[in-house]
């Protein structure tokens, strides 16, 4: 018997109140998800018991038949979900339920869109699925006992979803968790065997352990159906990945994805394969239709679910796929790994290395199929894939040398070919449009598309009709540092080193350039003397047709864009100075040859303008403004 003294009243954290209100008021049109989420949690609890039971069979407590039971009571207006999984201790209840979503709660709210379907998807993704119960219930009572604890260590948690909850210690003979939902007014349609079965078959048919309800039988006396004492399994209760592919519908594949990925939307694509030979395993891998909130958090644990002979071993087995494929969801079920496999064993396992290589091959093949398909539906899917995951795939150029060529073939960029913001140009597209004499793939990196498109470095390339790739993602500097060539064509930054257009430049142009370099030698020396340590050197350029000057990094130096990225990330930037290149045909440069009084000011203005044009920051903005104002004033006065 429990007394009031046993009951502890606690408050949710502040953000929990917002979350509960969201569940109740914002997701009502998707209210069926409450049962999906609670069944999914029950399934996870059974998986955890199976895993811990490998090393401690006593946890089963003479009850090895794992299942989930769904019941309803029309008179009490309740729905009950019972599992005999691992259960929770008092502290686990506080940690997992009293402290909503822990570190993910703020990100959850930041990610809300106002679209009910999309926001419903976020519930499972952020680990707050339990609270979907409050969509249909005005009171939730959870009673649980962790496997291995004695019956007097049961815990009862109860809340009306109004910002506080109660905890009490109770006796619970059976391990596992029982959740009773006291339905809100107007939710009586859920108190129907047909309705609950329909929801289970729609959302949870893939769950691998039985979901049971009491069987309905016809009662001749009352001329209606009544519940019998006989159990009936509602779902197929078998591992979907172990079934033949021709027996699985697309809807079943999609529902299983939603379960393993905690997603509300169907996936973009999937691959299901059984591998036999030296290694025997099954892989069911999915590419999501949208990026998760933590995609770029490489420290956050990502990975696949690992099973051994249908027994769940672990979530987030990151060793099964490389980091650049961390967006992939799904399962690997091995026939060869030991049941007591640990994360430490995974690090050293050659079997895992083989599974990893096979999984990478399948995922890249799936992406290639979308990229090369003639079907408009697949082409749209690839565009979605690239928009959501393209930046992450680029990491593979540095991480996965053995698949570098395959990954490079999948890369997409913006280019000067059509200047569209959407990244649609492949390296193969670029090569197919190269001029006959062209030997290199030209690119420029910048911190945004507008900055790249307006870069003065493009001027000679636009004049000669040479296409240039515009690389504007933060990862692109890392990409080109690790991708030196593609199918025999070297990649060349147009903002680094001496400009060498090779056969694209005729002999007469080269002779003219050599002559001009001599004619302007005195000017470049004088400018170098004025600018001092700001530049490595000043030299004539032929890459400009409209601008008076630009900055160029030395061949092996850090580019200005990369330097700014490193600085913004708090990393040390290697000490290097740019070249200032001047356009001998520009009126300002030709006038500067004969300027004496304002030569230093003009030289500094040219350098500062070039620095601003490439997205850099001035060391002395006030000095730049003063020199520019003096120049403008001089022009105005001379005009009078």
Curated annotation (Swiss-Prot):
Region (B), start-end ranges: 344-564
Q: What residue spans carry the region label C?
A: 565-640
This protein's GO CC annotations: cytoplasm
Note the SMART domains from the entry. Answer: HATPase_c
User: A Pfam family this protein belongs to?
Assistant: HSP90
The question of whether Metal-binding is a record keyword is answered with no
Report whether Thylakoid shows up as a keyword of the record.
no
Listed A to Z, the keywords are:
ATP-binding, Chaperone, Cytoplasm, Nucleotide-binding, Stress response
Q: What InterPro entries does the entry give?
A: HATPase_C_sf, Heat_shock_protein_90_CS, HSP90_C, Hsp90_fam, Hsp90_N, Ribosomal_Su5_D2-typ_SF
Query: CDD domains, alphabetically?
Result: HATPase_Hsp90-like
Tell me the Gene3D superfamilies matching this sequence. 3.30.230.80, 3.40.50.11260, Heat shock protein 90, C-terminal domain (1.20.120.790), Histidine kinase-like ATPase, C-terminal domain (3.30.565.10)
Function, please?
Answer: Molecular chaperone. Has ATPase activity.
Q: Would you identify the family this protein belongs to, as annotated?
A: Belongs to the heat shock protein 90 family.
Q: How does it assemble?
A: Homodimer.
This one is known as: Chaperone protein HtpG
Source organism per UniProt:
Nitrosomonas europaea (strain ATCC 19718 / CIP 103999 / KCTC 2705 / NBRC 14298)
The protein's gene is named htpG
């Amino acid at each position: 018997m429990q007394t009031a003294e046993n009951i502890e009243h606690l408050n949710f954290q502040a953000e929990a109140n917002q979350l509960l209100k969201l569940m109740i008021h914002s997701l009502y049109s998707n209210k069926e998800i409450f049962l999906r989420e609670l069944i999914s949690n029950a399934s996870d609890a059974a998986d955890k018991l199976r895993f811990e039971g490998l090393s401690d069979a006593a946890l089963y407590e003479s009850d090895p038949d794992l299942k989930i039971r769904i019941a309803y009571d029309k008179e009490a207006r309740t729905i009950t979900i019972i599992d005999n999984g691992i259960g929770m201790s008092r502290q686990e209840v506080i940690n997992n339920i009293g402290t909503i979503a822990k570190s993910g709660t703020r990100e959850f709210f930041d990610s809300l869109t106002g679209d009910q379907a999309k926001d419903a998807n976020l519930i499972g993704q952020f680990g707050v699925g339990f609270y979907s119960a409050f969509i249909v219930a005005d009171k939730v009572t959870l009673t649980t006992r962790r496997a291995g604890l004695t019956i007097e260590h049961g815990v009862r948690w109860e809340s009306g979803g109004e910002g506080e909850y109660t905890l009490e210690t109770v006796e619970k003979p059976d391990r596992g968790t029982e959740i009773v939902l006291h339905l809100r007014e107007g939710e009586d349609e859920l108190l129907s065997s047909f309705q609950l079965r329909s929801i289970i078959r729609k959302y949870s048919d893939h769950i691998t352990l039985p979901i049971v309800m009491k069987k309905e039988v016809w009662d001749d006396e009352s001329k209606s159906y009544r519940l019998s004492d006989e159990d009936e399994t509602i779902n197929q209760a078998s591992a979907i990945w172990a079934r033949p592919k021709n027996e699985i519908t697309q809807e079943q594949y999609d529902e299983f994805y939603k379960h393993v990925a905690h997603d509300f939307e169907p996936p973009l694509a999937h691959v299901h394969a059984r591998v036999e030979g030296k290694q025997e395993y099954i892989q069911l891998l999915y590419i999501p239709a949208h990026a998760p909130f933590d995609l770029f958090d490489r420290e956050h644990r990502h990975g696949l679910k690992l099973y051994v002979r249908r027994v769940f071993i672990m979530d987030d087995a990151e060793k099964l796929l490389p980091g650049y494929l961390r967006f992939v969801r799904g399962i690997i079920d091995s026939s060869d790994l030991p049941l007591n496999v640990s994360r430490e064993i995974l690090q050293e396992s050659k079997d895992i290395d083989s599974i990893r290589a096979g999984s990478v091959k399948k995922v890249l093949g799936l992406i290639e199929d979308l990229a090369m398909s003639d079907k408009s539906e697949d082409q749209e899917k690839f565009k979605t894939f690239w928009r959501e995951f393209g930046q992450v795939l680029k990491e593979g150029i540095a991480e996965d040398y053995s698949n570098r060529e395959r990954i490079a073939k999948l890369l997409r960029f913006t280019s000067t070919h059509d200047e569209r913001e959407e990244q649609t140009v492949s390296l193969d597209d670029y090569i197919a449009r190269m001029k006959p004499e062209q030997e290199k793939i030209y690119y420029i990196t910048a911190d945004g598309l507008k900055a790249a498109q307006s870069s003065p470095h493009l001027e000679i390339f636009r004049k000669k009709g040479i296409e240039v790739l515009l690389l504007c993602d933060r990862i692109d500097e890392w990409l080109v540092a690790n991708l030196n060539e593609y199918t025999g064509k070297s990649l060349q930054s147009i903002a680094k080193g001496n400009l060498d257009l090779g056969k694209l430049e005729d002999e007469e142009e080269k002779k003219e350039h050599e002559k001009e370099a001599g004619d302007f030698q005195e000017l470049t020396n004088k400018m170098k003397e004025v600018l001092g340590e700001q530049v490595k050197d000043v030299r004539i350029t032929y890459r400009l047709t409209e601008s008076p000057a630009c900055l160029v990094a030395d061949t092996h130096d850090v580019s200005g864009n990369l330097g700014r990225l490193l600085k913004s990330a708090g990393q040390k930037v290697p000490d290097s100075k740019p070249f200032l290149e001047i356009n001998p045909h520009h009126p300002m440069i030709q006038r500067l040859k004969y300027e004496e009084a304002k030569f230093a000011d003009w030289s500094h203005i040219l350098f500062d303008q070039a620095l601003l044009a490439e997205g850099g920051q001035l060391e002395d903005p006030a000095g730049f403004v003063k020199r520019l104002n003096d120049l403008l004033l001089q022009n105005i006065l001379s005009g009078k």
